């Protein structure tokens, strides 16, 4: 047995070594975050396959504070018996052998979303640590892996009545570079899609870093998906067109509804995997739709009456659709599966769409009439826009080189090296024109607010002077017939507005324009937001620009520490220079972390934890130690309480892990709230940082401690007090000017702070979650008032430093 065990483990490592050498082949880019998030989806896909087979109801995905992710499901649990060929547990085979699992035995899973049949073993190979917990047949099994190597065989650690699998992994920082932190939005987008595509599965996403949580649970499948996508828009007909059929082994499911907007949004999926670039299913859908609608309009006499002929683009204006196909052996144009190329899918989708859409139009004449009316309006608007463009072109022939008069162009002709600044107002535009580098920086001042394109029809948009100027300057045209992102004249478009409410509004209007009319420009990373400094600080004759509030805090502390000494008692050597600076920066970093945690735990408790002895993981096994520790914490909190709250405690027995976990209970205005300081909290990175600071501060200051700066000294009882006094002292003789408008700076200052490539700061505009972005633009910029009011009520308290 031992011989075969050795040889099989060597074979396994060879397989996983290949993954470590070429991780991109298995999970995508390891540099830009796509591969990192793909790791989560590989594990989630296994749970979804359990759900599709009817064994799993709930999946919980948690981003932990130490940047690990766990995926827990209540399925059958991975088999734990010994595998006949490999001689180790089946779970270990699944975790360590490529192309192992139930996907290849056609009886286990019919259609599977598991992406490349490599799944969880790849996640294991690319994780510095992975924890596997299986609940199955009344027992809890646990195993730990490091870089894909099991540290011990699968072991039974307890008993349970539940079933399911939990995989928690810490991504290897040797593999993943640049982007190493999980982004909530990217995970939320995919999990939301999965919950729609797998009707009835409940998926929870929790972020332990800031307490954010979402529950995705939709019964109506893709019909509910279309409802969700149309949530803040105004659908023009009540009945969603929906069908789900299967023919020759290909399942086709389509849901669609028109709204009163002008954007077309079609989302395509194959076996639950999204195709960003569409493919044969999208081609079949579009062809059938145009043909069926045109045939209906001809037959019912609409086209003749309206004297227009509609195109496919007119038919898809304001359309929201989801096309989901289930194909046993799909073919894609590349490993990333962004485009489906299986030719048999086109005819399958086209055939079903032709038949069933024609049926729907005949059975719902009211809906059909409304939809046809919208299509005719779109065709007329297209004609009007074409005429408007021709007018513009004729005028343009008289204009020099066809560029707007306000544009101060640059000498550079290579778009990759050219920058266009969109500047708010003529006064700032004047300063920017004087301060710029003429070689590669062009300036276009925009007067007033540009049109809100979310609410405007295409022909109205073209007649807006500011929008027309902007389109001409960019040079890539607009509208379906003319728009060509490759003709963009500047590869850096920099939005430069004031730091007040009007500036924010203009920036939002411009972003709406780019996102709705020229999405590729945003996707290719050509749009930036300039970050002019917020403050100018003057001390004596020295002047300094400061970018934001965080930098301002740092600046004040660096001045405060200049010449400061902290005496921990009357006779001890003073703490000064680098040692004091290190302690202050660690204290500030921990305070910032505590402020972020405040939404999940009471701030008073977190601050008190700094001064309490450290509770270790080993301590959690001893009930007496835990009780003593939490009792001391609660006593201190009650002694220092100033707002009338009452603090109590409890100890929770965690039978599954044989642990005792403290619970802090606070009663405010007669209402009790529990804050469990469980195993995860005690072993997490946040508590570790609190304890590290605590070890340095506990007992640091004695009764006669004082802080000294220059000639002045102050007795202090706590480190916090000492820091507050220092910052107040540092403000003497300091004049702080807060900039609101770009016009407040002269051309030299504007160049130095905002336009000089050596010293400026810019934010690149990216879109992580297209559906969430679409909803946000609709909520904030659309016609409906209610969703906007709800958004403001929900987020008002999170806004800080609003300049009105």
From Swiss-Prot:
InterPro entries: DNA_gyrase_B_C, GyrB, GyrB_hook, GyrB_insert, HATPase_C_sf, Ribosomal_Su5_D2-typ_SF, Ribsml_uS5_D2-typ_fold_subgr, Topo_IIA. It comes from the Bacteria. ATP binds at residues 5, 73, 102-103, 109, 115-120, 335-337. Residues 2-220 are annotated as: ATPase domain. One of its GO terms (molecular function) is DNA negative supercoiling activity. Changing residue 164 to V: Resistance to coumarin antibiotics, decreased ATPase and DNA supercoiling. Changing residue 42 to D: 7% supercoiling activity, 16% DNA-dependent ATPase activity, fluoroquinolone-induced DNA cleavage normal, 40% ATP-independent DNA relaxation, binds ATP normally, complements the N4177 ts mutant. Binds two Mg(2+) per subunit. The magnesium ions form salt bridges with both the protein and the DNA. Can also accept other divalent metal cations, such as Mn(2+) or Ca(2+). DNA gyrase negatively supercoils closed circular double-stranded DNA in an ATP-dependent manner to maintain chromosomes in an underwound state. This makes better substrates for topoisomerase 4 (ParC and ParE) which is the main enzyme that unlinks newly replicated chromosomes in E.coli. Gyrase catalyzes the interconversion of other topological isomers of double-stranded DNA rings, including catenanes. Relaxes negatively supercoiled DNA in an ATP-independent manner. Heterotetramer, composed of two GyrA and two GyrB chains. In the heterotetramer, GyrA contains the active site tyrosine that forms a transient covalent intermediate with the DNA, while GyrB binds cofactors and catalyzes ATP hydrolysis. This is DNA gyrase subunit B. It comes from Escherichia coli (strain K12). The gene is gyrB.
């Amino acid at each position: 047995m031992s011989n075969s065990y050795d040889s099989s483990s060597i074979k396994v490592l060879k397989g996983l070594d290949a993954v470590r050498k070429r991780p991109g082949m298995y999970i995508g880019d390891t540099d830009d975050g796509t591969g990192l998030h793909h790791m989560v989806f590989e594990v989630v896909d296994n749970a979804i396959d359990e759900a599709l087979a009817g064994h799993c109801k709930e999946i919980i995905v948690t981003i932990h504070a130490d940047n690990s992710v766990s995926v827990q499901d209540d399925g059958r649990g991975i088999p734990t018996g010994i595998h006949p060929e490999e001689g180790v547990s089946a779970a270990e085979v699944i975790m360590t052998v490529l192309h192992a699992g139930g996907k290849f035995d056609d009886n286990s899973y019919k259609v599977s979303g598991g992406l490349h049949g490599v799944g969880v073993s790849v996640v294991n190979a690319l994780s510095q640590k992975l924890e596997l917990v299986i609940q199955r047949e009344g027992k809890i099994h646990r195993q730990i892996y490091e870089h894909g190597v099991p540290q011990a065989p699968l072991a039974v650690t307890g008993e349970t009545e539940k079933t399911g699998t939990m995989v928690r992994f810490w991504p290897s920082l040797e593999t993943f570079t640049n982007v190493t932190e999980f982004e909530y939005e990217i995970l939320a987008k995919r999990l939301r899609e999965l919950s729609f595509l797998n009707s009835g599965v409940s998926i929870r996403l929790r972020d332990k870093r800031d307490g954010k949580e979402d529950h995705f649970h939709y019964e109506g499948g893709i019909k509910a998906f279309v409802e969700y996508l149309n949530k803040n828009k105004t659908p023009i007909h009540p009945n969603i067109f929906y069908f789900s059929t299967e023919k020759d082994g290909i399942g086709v499911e389509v849901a669609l509804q028109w709204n009163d907007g002008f954007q077309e949004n079609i989302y395509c999926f194959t076996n639950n995997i999204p195709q960003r670039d569409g493919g044969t299913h999208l081609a079949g859908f579009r062809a059938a739709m145009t043909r069926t609608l045109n045939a209906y309009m001809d037959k019912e006499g609409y086209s003749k009456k309206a004297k227009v002929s509609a195109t496919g683009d007119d038919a898809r204006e304001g359309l929201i659709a989801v096309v989901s196909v289930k194909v046993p052996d799909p073919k894609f144009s590349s490993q990333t599966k962004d485009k489906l190329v299986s030719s048999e899918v086109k005819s399958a989708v086209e055939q079903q769409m032709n038949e069933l859409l024609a049926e729907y139009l005949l059975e719902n004449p009211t809906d059909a009439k409304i939809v046809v009316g919208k299509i005719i309006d779109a065709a007329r608007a297209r004609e009007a826009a074409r005429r408007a463009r021709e007018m513009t072109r004729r005028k343009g022939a008289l204009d020099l080189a066809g560029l707007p008069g306000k544009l101060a162009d640059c000498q550079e002709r290579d778009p990759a090296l050219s920058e266009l600044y969109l500047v708010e107002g003529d006064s700032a535009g004047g300063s920017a024109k004087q301060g710029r580098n003429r070689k590669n920086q062009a300036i276009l001042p925009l007067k007033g607010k540009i049109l809100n394109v979310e609410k405007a029809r295409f022909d109205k948009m073209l007649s807006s002077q500011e929008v027309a100027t902007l389109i001409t300057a960019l040079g890539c045209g607009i509208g379906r017939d003319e728009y060509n992102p490759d003709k963009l004249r500047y590869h850096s478009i920099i939005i430069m507005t004031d730091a007040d409410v009007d500036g924010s509004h203009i920036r939002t209007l411009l972003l709406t324009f780019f996102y709705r009319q020229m999405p590729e420009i945003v996707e290719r990373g050509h749009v930036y937001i300039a970050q002019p400094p917020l403050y100018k600080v003057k001390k004596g004759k020295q002047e300094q620009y400061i970018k934001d509030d965080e930098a301002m805090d740092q600046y004040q502390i660096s001045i405060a520490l200049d010449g400061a000494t902290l005496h921990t008692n009357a006779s001890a050597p003073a703490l000064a220079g680098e040692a004091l600076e290190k302690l202050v920066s660690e204290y500030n970093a921990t305070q910032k972390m505590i402020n972020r945690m405040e939404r999940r735990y009471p701030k008073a408790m977190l601050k008190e934890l700094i001064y309490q002895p450290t509770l270790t993981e080993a301590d959690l096994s001893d009930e007496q130690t835990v009780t003593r520790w939490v009792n001391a914490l609660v006593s201190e909190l009650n002694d220092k309480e100033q707002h009338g709250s009452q603090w109590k405690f409890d100890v929770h027995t965690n039978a599954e892990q044989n642990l005792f976990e403290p619970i802090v209970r606070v009663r405010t205005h007669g209402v009790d709230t529990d804050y469990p300081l469980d195993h995860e909290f005690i072993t997490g990175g946040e508590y570790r940082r609190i304890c590290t600071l605590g070890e340095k501060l506990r007992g640091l200051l004695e009764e006669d401690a004082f802080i000294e700066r220059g000639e002045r000294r102050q007795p202090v009882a706590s480190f916090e007090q000492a820091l507050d006094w220092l910052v107040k002292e540092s403000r003497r003789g300091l004049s702080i000017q807060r900039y609101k408008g770009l016009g407040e700076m002269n051309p030299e200052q504007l160049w130095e702070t905002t336009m000089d490539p050596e010293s400026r700061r810019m934010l690149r505009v990216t879109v992580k979650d297209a559906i969430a972005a679409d909803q946000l633009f609709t909520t904030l910029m659309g016609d409906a008032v209610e969703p906007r009011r709800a958004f403001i009520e929900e987020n008002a308290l999170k806004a800080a430093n609003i300049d009105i």
